[in-house]
C-alpha cells in the first residue's frame, strides 16, 4: 500500500512541483533553512496550484488532517520552557497536499543537528501536556546518522494512509536529529492499552522493514524519570 501511494501520486504532482522550485530529481533549486518551504508561506502553498490554469489536481482527502511542526535547534537554545520554540508549519488534508509539502521540505538527513520535525493529527500538539497525549506513550526506532529518510517517509505514509489496525490510537510521529544518530518515535494516546500498543509496534516494524527490537515508554514515566525511564513493552 505504501508503494502504491508513492507511485500513484508522484506523477500527479510533477507540474505543481516544477513551479515550486523542485526539480524532477527531487532536489530544491535553492538552499532552504531547516523546515522552510519553497515559495514562502503556507498561503502561497495552499493557493499556488489553483492560481495557474491547467495545474488543478483532483484531491484525494485523507481521513484526518495532519500538521507538520518544527523545533529548530537555534530557537531551543534560547527558550524559557520546553516546547516554546515549537511551531506549526502547515496543515494538510489530502494526498496531494501531503506530497506538495513533503517535496518542498528538507529530509531528516538535511536538517541541522538538534532539530525535531513532527507530523501530528491536526489539533493535537506534540507535547506531553496535550490532553490527547497525556496518558499515552511512544515507540522509538534508532538509526545511524543520515539513515532515517526512507523510514521517516514510510512512517508518514502508514500514518496518513490509515494502515494501522489501531490508527485511532496514534497521535503522530517525530524525527529527532542528533549528533551521532537519528530517532523516529511514534506517539500514541492510550499507553495502558497493551494489546493496541503491541499491535502498533509490530505493524510499524513491518511497514518499514525494521528488524531491531523497539521499546515503548509511557510519557508519564518519561516526565518523572527522564532518561531512567524503562520500556514497558517491546516488540
Curated annotation (Swiss-Prot):
Disulfide bonds: 133-171
Biased segments, Basic and acidic residues type: 16-25
Segments of this protein annotated with the region EIF4G-binding: 60-63, 70-106, 154-163
A Pfam short name: IF4E
Matches recorded under InterPro entries: TIF_eIF4e-like, TIF_eIF_4E, TIF_eIF_4E_CS
Any further remark recorded for this protein: Displayed sequence is from cv. Salinas, cv. Fiona, cv. Girelle, cv. Jessy, cv. Vanguard, cv. Mariska, cv. Trocadero and cv. 87-20M, allele Ls-eIF4E(0), and is associated with susceptibility to lettuce mosaic virus (LMV).
Coiled-coil features, chain-numbered ranges: none
Effect of residue 191 to S: In strain: Alize, Classic, Floribibb, Malika, Mantilia, Oriana and Presidio, alleles mo1(1) and Ls-eIF4E(1)
Family (UniProt): Belongs to the eukaryotic initiation factor 4E family.
Biased composition (Acidic residues): 26-36
Compartmental location: Nucleus; Cytoplasm
Lineage: superkingdom: Eukaryota
Keywords carried by this UniProt record: Cytoplasm, Disulfide bond, Host-virus interaction, Initiation factor, Nucleus, Plant defense, Protein biosynthesis, RNA-binding, Translation regulation
Complex formation: EIF4F is a multi-subunit complex, the composition of which varies with external and internal environmental conditions. It is composed of at least EIF4A, EIF4E and EIF4G. EIF4E is also known to interact with other partners. In higher plants two isoforms of EIF4F have been identified, named isoform EIF4F and isoform EIF(iso)4F. Isoform EIF4F has subunits p220 and p26, whereas isoform EIF(iso)4F has subunits p82 and p28. (Microbial infection) Interacts with potyvirus viral genome-linked protein (VPg); this interaction is possible in susceptible hosts but impaired in resistant plants.
Record: residues binding mRNA: 78-83, 110, 128-129, 178-183, 223-227
Effect ascribed to mutating residue 75 to P: In strain: Autumn Gold, Desert Storm, Salinas 88 and Vanguard 75, alleles mo1(2) and Ls-eIF4E(2)
GO molecular function: RNA binding; translation initiation factor activity
Region Disordered, residue ranges: 16-56
UniProt-recorded name of the protein: Eukaryotic translation initiation factor 4E-1
Amino acid at each position: 500500500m505504501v508503494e502504491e501511494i508513492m507511485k500513484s501520486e508522484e506523477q500527479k504532482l510533477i507540474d505543481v512541483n516544477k513551479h515550486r522550485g523542485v526539480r524532477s530529481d527531487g532536489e530544491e533549486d535553492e538552499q532552504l533553512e531547516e523546515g522552510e518551504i519553497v515559495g514562502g508561506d503556507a498561503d502561497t502553498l495552499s493557493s499556488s496550484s489553483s492560481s495557474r490554469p491547467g495545474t488543478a489536481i483532483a484531491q484525494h482527502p485523507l481521513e484526518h488532517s495532519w500538521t507538520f511542526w518544527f523545533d529548530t535547534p537555534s530557537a531551543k537554545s534560547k527558550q524559557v520552557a520546553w516546547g516554546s520554540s515549537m511551531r506549526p508549519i502547515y496543515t494538510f488534508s489530502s494526498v496531494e497536499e501531503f506530497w506538495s509539502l513533503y517535496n518542498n521540505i528538507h529530509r531528516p538527513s538535511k536538517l541541522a543537528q538538534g532539530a525535531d520535525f513532527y507530523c501530528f493529527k491536526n489539533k493535537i500538539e506534540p507535547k506531553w501536556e496535550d490532553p490527547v497525549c497525556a496518558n499515552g506513550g511512544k515507540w522509538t526506532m534508532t538509526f545511524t546518522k543520515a539513515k532515517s529518510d526512507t523510514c521517516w517517509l514510510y512512517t508518514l505514509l502508514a500514518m496518513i494512509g490509515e494502515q494501522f489496525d489501531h490508527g485511532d490510537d496514534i497521535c503522530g510521529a517525530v524525527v529527532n536529529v542528533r549528533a551521532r544518530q537519528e530517532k523516529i518515535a511514534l506517539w500514541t494516546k492510550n499507553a495502558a492499552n497493551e494489546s493496541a500498543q503491541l499491535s502498533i509496534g509490530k505493524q510499524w516494524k513491518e511497514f518499514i522493514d525494521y528488524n531491531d527490537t523497539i521499546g515503548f515508554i509511557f510519557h508519564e514515566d518519561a516526565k518523572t524519570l527522564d532518561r531512567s525511564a524503562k520500556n514497558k513493552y517491546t516488540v
